[in-house]
Amino acid sequence: TYTASQGLLLMIPNMYKIAGEFLPCVFHVSARTLASHALCIFGDHQDVMSARQTGFAMLAEGSVQEVMDLAGVAHLATIKSRVPFMNFFDGFRTSHEIQKIEMLENDDLAPLIDQEALAEFRARALNPMKPVARGMAENPDHFFQHRESCNNYYEAVPAIVEEYMNEISKITGRKYGLFDYYGAEDAERVIIAMGSVTEAAREAIDYLVANGEKVGMVAVHLYRPFSAKHFLAAVPKTAKTIAVLDRTKEPGANGEPLYLDVKDCFYGAENAPVIVGGRYGLGSKDTTPAQILSVFENLAMPMPKNH
C-alpha cells in the first residue's frame, strides 16, 4: 500500500486491528505533512508520527537506494515476525527524486523468505471449511492480559529486522543497521535523525571531521519498536552533547517523539550526555548542510539551546 498524509490517518482505526490481530502487511508511506492551519501537500513526518502508537513497526529510509534495499527488509520481516510494518521515506524529497540505483530483483529476495512462517500465515487464512472466530469482544477480566500478550512479538522484531538487514547487506555490499553511525569514532557532538536530512548531515560531518572536529550522527532506521540496546550501542561513548532532530510538531508537548525516545534511553545513566531537541523541515522546508553546521555549533556551547 502506498499512501500518505490524511490518507494514512484514515487507516488508523484499521491499523490498530491489523496489528492487534498480527496480520503481516507493509504500508509504504511517502511521509507528508497534515493539513492544520493551512493545506500543505509537502514532506515531513507528521503523518507517520500520528500512527506510531498503532502497533505497526516503523522502518525509515533517507535515500532512494535505501528505499530499494530496506523495503524488502520490511516485507521479509513482517512475514517472520507477524508484526505489520510502516515503511516510510520523505515525501517529495525522496519519493520524487530521480536517481541511479542498484535494483534488487525478486530472485534476490525469494530465497530469503521464511517459508515456514509463510506457510503458517496461509494456514491462518479464513476458511469456511475450518471456521474460527477472531477479534471478538472482551470484558475487563481478560482484555488487559491479552493486550499485554503481544510484548514478546515486539521484543523479537529488532533481531528479525537486523537479521534481514545483514542478508540484504550480503547481496548489495551496503551495510545497514537498526541505527547507523556516521562520523568521527571519538565524536563528542552527535546528531540523531532519520529520513533524508541524514544525507545533508553527512556532508556537514565530512567537512567538520576533515577540519579536526569530533562530530557524528546516528541515522535511525527501525523507529518502532525502538531498541534502546541497539541505539546505545550506536552512540559513541565519547558523546557529551546530543541534538535530536524531529520532522514533526506536537503542539503542547514537552518534546517531539524521537527526542523523547532518546531522552528515555539515557534516563538514569551515569555521565549521560546533554540532550537537546530541534525541529526542522516542516512542509518540505529545505534543511541545508549550513544549518546542520549551526546545530553542531549549538552543541559546542556551554549551555546548548533546547527546542
Residue ranges and their predicted role:
Residues 1-52, 56-79:
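Thiamine diphosphate
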